């Protein structure tokens, strides 16, 4: 019996999708998982026969009765994913479905796909969901899989020697401003530094600097010099589900914490309570409140918080959340 894990290729190097799947693969390889590479492509170019042959090639290293962690979705469409699931089940492969995103819940226009995704989730022997809220929502939609694990936090593996964060009353935001209209109008006194090539500041914005996209190594080093990491909602964007942000977990949270700095998140974020309870950051319901949190912080409080985060960031750096998930998932395969 061998262990396998799918890993996506073919998207832009700065894609969160690619970065997340590649990070899981890197961590899983330390536990003996073998990579099953899947290339992102336009499935419309395949006839049913060609897709079938493509999947046979992808599955060539998998034997009857093996264990596969399927990082979901592949972004090749549910037809591709569903056929792969069916072929794996024909080979009596034990499937651990590691959900990164639930496509029918991301955008209102995709909700019609819910039955197709539930079909795959319900075929899974073990399901890994992002949060307790997502677990509850999927069960309301018709999820019947009994063995369900909750991820809770993304890891962010790296081999860098980071700085010790200095106390700075400034905010960082790593992400496209196009998806966060509120931040394009930033007008608080606290400086906001944005690392993105997408989106522009409005004419009324102040204390806002857009510094361009940075590679992961550059970003972590810059963040680790000190300040606060900001995570914000996308509720103003047409077509995006208002609830999705409350169900999924944020990669940005892990990036900031891995760099060793406190985070400020919306209270609606699925991990908000955990962040506050663990002393890793703060909740805020408005950008004015975000500014007030930073403005009222003092050196002693900041150092106490970053000392706490230093211990937690080691877990993310070394991939312990993912390692525990994968070990627990395999354990649950063997027990009733």
Swiss-Prot record:
GO molecular function: nucleotide binding; UDP-glucosyltransferase activity
Keyword entries, A-Z: Glycosyltransferase, Nucleotide-binding, Transferase
Region (Substrate protein-binding loop): 106-111
Nucleotide-binding found in the keyword field: yes
Entry's Gene Ontology BP terms: protein glycosylation
Pathway connected to this protein: Protein modification; protein glycosylation
EC number: 2.4.1.-
Record: residues binding UDP: 16, 179, 250-255
Domain of life: Bacteria
Subunit description: Homotetramer; a dimer of dimers.
Swiss-Prot/TrEMBL domain comment: Binds protein substrate via an exposed loop in the N-terminus. Dimerizes via the C-terminus; dimerization is required for tetramer formation. Binds protein substrate via an exposed loop in the N-terminus.
Family of the protein in this entry: Belongs to the Gtf3 glucosyltransferase family.
Role according to the record: Required for polymorphic O-glycosylation of the serine-rich repeat protein PsrP. Catalyzes the second step in glycosylation of the serine-rich repeat protein in this bacteria. Transfers glucose from UDP-glucose to the terminal GlcNAc moiety of 3-O-(N-acetyl-alpha-D-glucosaminyl)-L-seryl-[protein] which results from the first glycosylation step of PsrP (using the short substrate SRR1-GlcNAc). Has weak hydrolytic activity against UDP-glucose and even weaker activity on UDP-galactose. Does not complement deletion of the gtf3 gene from S.parasanguinis strain FW213.
Note: Encoded in RD10, a pathogenicity island with an atypical GC content that is associated with invasive pneumococcal disease. Pathogenicity islands account for greater than half the genomic diversity observed between isolates. The main function of this island seems to be correct synthesis and export of pneumococcal serine-rich repeat protein PsrP.
Name of this chain's protein: Glucosyltransferase 3
Organism, as annotated: Streptococcus pneumoniae serotype 4 (strain ATCC BAA-334 / TIGR4)
């Amino acid at each position: 019996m061998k262990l396998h894990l799918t890993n996506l290729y073919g998207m832009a190097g700065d894609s969160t999708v690619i970065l997340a799947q590649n990070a899981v693969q890197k961590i899983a390889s330390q536990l003996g998982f073998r990579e099953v590479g899947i290339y992102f492509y336009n499935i419309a170019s395949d006839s049913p026969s060609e897709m079938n042959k493509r999947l046979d090639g992808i599955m060539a290293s998998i034997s009857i009765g093996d264990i596969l962690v399927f990082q979901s979705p592949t972004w090749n469409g549910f037809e591709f994913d569903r056929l792969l699931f069916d072929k794996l089940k024909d080979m009596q492969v034990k499937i651990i479905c590691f959900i990164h995103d639930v496509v029918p819940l991301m955008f209102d226009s995709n909700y019609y796909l819910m039955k197709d995704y539930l079909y795959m989730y319900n075929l899974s022997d073990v399901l890994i969901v992002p949060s307790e809220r997502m677990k509850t929502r999927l069960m309301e939609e018709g999820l019947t899989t009994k063995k369900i694990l909750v991820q809770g936090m993304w890891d962010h593996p790296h081999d860098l020697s980071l700085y010790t964060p200095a106390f700075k009353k400034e905010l960082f935001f790593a992400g496209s401003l196009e998806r966060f209209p509120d931040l394009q109008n930033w007008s608080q006194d606290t400086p906001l530094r944005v690392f993105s090539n997408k989106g522009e500041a409005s004419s009324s914005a102040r204390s806002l600097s857009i510094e361009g996209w940075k590679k992961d190594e550059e970003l972590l080093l810059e963040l680790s010099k000190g300040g606060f990491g900001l995570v914000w909602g996308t509720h103003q964007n047409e077509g995006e589900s208002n609830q999705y942000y409350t169900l999924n977990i944020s990669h940005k949270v892990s990036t900031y914490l891995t760099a060793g700095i406190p985070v400020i998140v919306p209270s609606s974020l699925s991990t908000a309570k955990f962040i506050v309870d663990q002393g890793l950051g703060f909740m805020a319901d408005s950008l004015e409140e975000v500014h007030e949190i930073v403005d009222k912080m003092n050196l002693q409080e900041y150092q106490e918080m970053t000392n706490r985060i230093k211990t937690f960031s080691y877990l993310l750096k070394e991939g312990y959340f993912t390692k525990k998930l994968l070990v627990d998932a395999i354990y649950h395969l063997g027990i009733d």
